[in-house]
C-alpha cells in the first residue's frame, strides 16, 4: 500500500485492480475478499498482463522448453546410432573416443539438426499453452467453486442480477483470461498462417466479445462457468503434441489425445449446451428487461439475443472442430497415430530443406 501511494496516479491502473468498492452486506461468495466494480481503466491492467504473458512465453520457450527438447532429441538420435553400430566393434561411444573428441559416427548431420530444430520449435510453442491452461483452469476451478452456481443447473447464475460488486479473484480471473485471448490474437497474426486461421480468429473475436460484454454487463457468473468449461480440454491437446514431438512411444500421445477428445466432448458438447440453454430460457425468465446503467442493468431483448447467438456460434464452430477430432480418433483406431487436423503442421510432409516455421496451437 505504501509503495502504491508513492507511484504516480496514472501508473496505478496498469499494476493494480481499479475501482474498489464496499463489500456487499451479505455476500454469497468470497466474503473476506476486497470487492471491485468494472471500470474502463481495467483495460490498462489487461495491457500489462499481455506484456507479462509475452515475457513469460518467451522465457519458458527459450529458457526451458527449447533447451530440454533439443537435449532430449539430440541424445535420442545419438543413442539410437550407438545401439545400431556399437555391437559391431564392442567399444563405440556416443560421448567420445577417449581423446576428448566426439565420435564422428554419432555426430548430428545437417538433416538431423533441421529435423530437431523443427520439433524443438513446435514443442516449445505447445509448452506455453500447457503451462497457461493448467494454471488458469486450476484458478478458474477455485473461483467457480466459491460461486453459488452449479454446472449441471446454472440457474443460480442469474439470481441476484446485477452482480455489480466483483470479488478480487473473479475480477483477476476475467482480466487474465481476456488478456490471454488478446495475446493469442496477436500471435495468430504475427506468425505463419495455419489452415484454420480464419476459424481460429473468428473464434477468438467472438470469445473476446463475449468476455467483454459479460464483464461490463454484469453477467460474470455465467461467464466464469463458460471459461472454466472451455479451458479444460485445451490442456491435453498441446500436451499430446509435445509428447509426439519428443518421439515418445505412440501410446502416450494417443492416450493423451483420447483424454483431450473425452474432455472436449463432455465440456463443449454436453455441459456447454446446458449453459446455452440456461442463457436462452432462465436468463429471460429470471431477469426482467431493463436498461439502467446507473443500477447495473443491461438486459434488453437485443442484448439477450446477442448473448445466446454468440454462444450458439461458438458451439457451431466447436462442432465443426469436433468432426475433425473424430477423424483423428479414427486414425488412432486404425493404427495411424494421432495428429492434429485443426492446424497446419508445416513441414510435416516437407523435405527437410524446407522452411522451418513457428506454429502456435
Model-inferred region functions:
Residues 232, 268, 322:
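Hydrophobic, well-ordered secondary-structure elements that form the walls
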Residues 204, 268, 318:
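Short, conserved phosphate/pyrophosphate- and ester-handling motifs at nucleotide-, phospho-/glycolipid
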Residues 1-218, 244-248, 253-264, 272-313, ...:
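Membrane-helix and juxtamembrane interface regions of eukaryotic multi-pass membrane proteins
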Residues 229-240:
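Alpha-helical transmembrane segments and their membrane-interface exit regions
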Residues 227-231, 260-265:
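Transmembrane helix-bundle signature of multi-pass membrane transporters/permeases
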Residues 210, 223, 237-239, 255-256:
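Extended hydrophobic/aromatic segments used for targeting, binding, or gating
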Residues 215-227:
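Transmembrane alpha-helix entry/boundary detector in multi-pass membrane proteins
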Amino acid at each position: 500500500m505504501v509503495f502504491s501511494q508513492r507511484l504516480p496516479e496514472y501508473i496505478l491502473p496498469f499494476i493494480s485492480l481499479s475501482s474498489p468498492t464496499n463489500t456487499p452486506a451479505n455476500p454469497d461468495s468470497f466474503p473476506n475478499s476486497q470487492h471491485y466494480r468494472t471500470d474502463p481503466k481495467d483495460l490498462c491492467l489487461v495491457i500489462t498482463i499481455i506484456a507479462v504473458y509475452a515475457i513469460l512465453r518467451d522465457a519458458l520457450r527459450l529458457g526451458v522448453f527449447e533447451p530440454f527438447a533439443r537435449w532430449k532429441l539430440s541424445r535420442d538420435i545419438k543413442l539410437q546410432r550407438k545401439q545400431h553400430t556399437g555391437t559391431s566393434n564392442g567399444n563405440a561411444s556416443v560421448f567420445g573416443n577417449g581423446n576428448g573428441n566426439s565420435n564422428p559416427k554419432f555426430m548430428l548431420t545437417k538433416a538431423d539438426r533441421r529435423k530437431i530444430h523443427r520439433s524443438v520449435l513446435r514443442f516449445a510453442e505447445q509448452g506455453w499453452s500447457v503451462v497457461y491452461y493448467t494454471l488458469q483452469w486450476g484458478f478458474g476451478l477455485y473461483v467457480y467453486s466459491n460461486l453459488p452456481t452449479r454446472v449441471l443447473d446454472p440457474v443460480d447464475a442469474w439470481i441476484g442480477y446485477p452482480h455489480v460488486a466483483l470479488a478480487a479473484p473473479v475480477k483477476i480471473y476475467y482480466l487474465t483470461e481476456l488478456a490471454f485471448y488478446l495475446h493469442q490474437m496477436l500471435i495468430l497474426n504475427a506468425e505463419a498462417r495455419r489452415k484454420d486461421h480464419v476459424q481460429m480468429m473468428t473464434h477468438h473475436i467472438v470469445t473476446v466479445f463475449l468476455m467483454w460484454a459479460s464483464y461490463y454487463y454484469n453477467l460474470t457468473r455465467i461467464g466464469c462457468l463458460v471459461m472454466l468449461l472451455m479451458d479444460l480440454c485445451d490442456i491435453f491437446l498441446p500436451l499430446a503434441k509435445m509428447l509426439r514431438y519428443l518421439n515418445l512411444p505412440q501410446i502416450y500421445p494417443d492416450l493423451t489425445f483420447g483424454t483431450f477428445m473425452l474432455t472436449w466432448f463432455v465440456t463443449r458438447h454436453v455441459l456447454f449446451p446446458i449453459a446455452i440453454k440456461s442463457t436462452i430460457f432462465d436468463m429471460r425468465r429470471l431477469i426482467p428487461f431493463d436498461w439502467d446503467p446507473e443500477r447495473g442493468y443491461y438486459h434488453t431483448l437485443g442484448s439477450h439475443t446477442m448473448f445466446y447467438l454468440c454462444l450458439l456460434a461458438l458451439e457451431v464452430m466447436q462442432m465443426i472442430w469436433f468432426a475433425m477430432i473424430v477423424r483423428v480418433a479414427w486414425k488412432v483406431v486404425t493404427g495411424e497415430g494421432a495428429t492434429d487436423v485443426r492446424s497446419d503442421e508445416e513441414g510435416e510432409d516437407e523435405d527437410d530443406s524446407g522452411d522451418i516455421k513457428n506454429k502456435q496451437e
